[in-house]
């Protein structure tokens, strides 16, 4: 039997339409005006002006829509389960909303309206298509002095000559979007450190990503291809292990082509030791010279995967301070102190450090620093610089 929702007077047991008629603020209701079947992806309680609002993100027909409910439906309905739902359209003088009225758990297959793509092409980005596709998750980094995170995936891509290759593609997200994207993977937690732990544990794992939007950006003669997370985007561990795309991604160890950049790819290295120096000039073009040692770097960037004879060498990378953004002297000195602190903490074995860099394709392998991740093993806590 379907459960009927209740609103403000939630324990009254009165039918919704009758309670609305008795409310002090007149409302017009179209009861059960629409029925849907879908999977509850997540739910959230919001407190605005001392009034509670209950929101539900439900996926139906490969789209995630948000609906209002009440405390009873919030208590009854469980994330990850599927429901047959009837909806009310409620209209007042100042607002209109769609609310869950009756709901009943059901069995259903979540079908995708958009078919799975075996590979990406330039057309997907030209048309800004939303795609469902199998990907390898590589890593996430946070840009220094920014609140922006970048997620790096590997995916099969066919160029204009129809030649398939495994390439890197990047996706920009803020903290809230990142938590929402992986909320089902971390059991509904709102702690971003839980997201970082999950992602570190699942580096190089194969996922299926749904409703990710392709985007093309022009900068002079260069074309950059990126992904955008939209409201209906979701990601889950891939179960199609027999597919050709899964096999291609699994067999690729280090993609050197990044379609989100020009003649560079993104790499991450666990650092043994690190040192940095601030270089300033009269033009205000400040940069940090960051040198580090890593046992992994020479293996990962060697074309034949052989190790260098000198694994203990210093590797030079550069972080350019954003000259388009006014950087106060105090902020620059704070960043200088942070780099210095990381060096000392690493030397004293109090933290572990991962560095994220762009690597130029070609002989020089010049590197620019993107981000630094600190890991406190005692607290099991990750923090980006």
UniProtKB/Swiss-Prot annotation:
Question: What main location does UniProt list?
Answer: host cell
Q: Where is this region: Nuclear localization signal?
A: 26-32
Species the sequence originates in: Autographa californica nuclear polyhedrosis virus
* Name the record gives this protein: Late expression factor 3
Q: Which gene encodes it?
A: LEF-3
| InterPro entries tied to this protein | Baculo_LEF-3 (IPR008415)
Q: Which UniProt keywords apply?
A: DNA-binding, Early protein, Host nucleus, Transcription, Transcription regulation
Per the record, the domain of life is: Viruses
Function per UniProt: Single-stranded DNA-binding protein that plays a role in viral DNA replication. Forms a stable complex with the alkaline nuclease and mediates the transport of the helicase to the host nucleus.
**Entry's Gene Ontology cellular component terms:** nuclear viral factory
On assembly, the entry states: Homotrimer. Interacts with alkaline nuclease. Interacts with HELI and IE1.
Subcellular location(s) of the protein:
Host nucleus
């Amino acid at each position: 039997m379907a459960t009927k929702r209740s609103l403000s007077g939630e324990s009254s047991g009165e039918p919704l339409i009758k309670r609305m008629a008795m409310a002090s603020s007149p409302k017009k209701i179209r009861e059960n005006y629409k029925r849907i079947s879908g999977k509850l992806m997540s739910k959230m309680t919001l407190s605005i002006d001392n009034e509670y609002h209950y929101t539900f993100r439900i996926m139906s027909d490969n789209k995630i829509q948000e609906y209002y409910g009440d405390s009873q439906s919030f208590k009854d309905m469980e994330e990850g389960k599927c429901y047959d739902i009837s909806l009310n359209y409620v209209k007042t003088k100042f607002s209109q909303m769609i609310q869950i009225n009756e709901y009943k758990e059901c069995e259903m297959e979540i079908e995708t309206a958009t078919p799975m793509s075996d590979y990406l092409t330039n057309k997907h980005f030209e048309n800004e298509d939303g795609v469902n596709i199998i990907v390898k998750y590589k890593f996430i980094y946070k840009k220094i002095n920014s609140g922006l995170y970048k997620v790096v995936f590997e995916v099969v891509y066919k160029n204009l000559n129809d030649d398939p290759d495994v390439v890197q593609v990047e996706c920009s997200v803020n903290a809230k979007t990142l938590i929402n994207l992986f909320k089902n993977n971390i059991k509904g937690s709102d702690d971003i450190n839980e997201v970082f732990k999950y992602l570190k544990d699942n580096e190089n794992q194969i996922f299926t990503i749904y409703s990710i939007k392709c985007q093309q950006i022009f900068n002079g003669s260069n074309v950059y291809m990126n992904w955008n997370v939209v409201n209906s985007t979701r990601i889950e561990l891939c179960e199609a292990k027999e597919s050709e795309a899964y096999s291609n991604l699994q067999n690729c160890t280090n993609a050197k082509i990044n379609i989100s950049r020009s003649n560079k790819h993104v790499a991450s290295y666990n650092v043994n030791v690190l040192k940095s120096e601030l270089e300033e000039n009269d033009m205000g073009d400040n940069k940090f010279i960051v040198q580090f040692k890593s046992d992994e770097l020479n293996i990962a960037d060697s074309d034949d995967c052989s190790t260098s004879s000198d694994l203990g060498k210093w590797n030079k990378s550069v972080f350019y301070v954003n000259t388009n953004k006014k950087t106060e002297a105090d902020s620059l000195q704070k960043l200088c102190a942070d780099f210095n602190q990381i060096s000392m903490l690493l030397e004293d074995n109090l933290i572990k450090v991962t560095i994220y860099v762009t690597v130029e394709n070609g002989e020089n392998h010049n590197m620019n620093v993107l981000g630094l991740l600190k890991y406190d093993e005692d607290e099991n806590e990750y923090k980006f610089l």
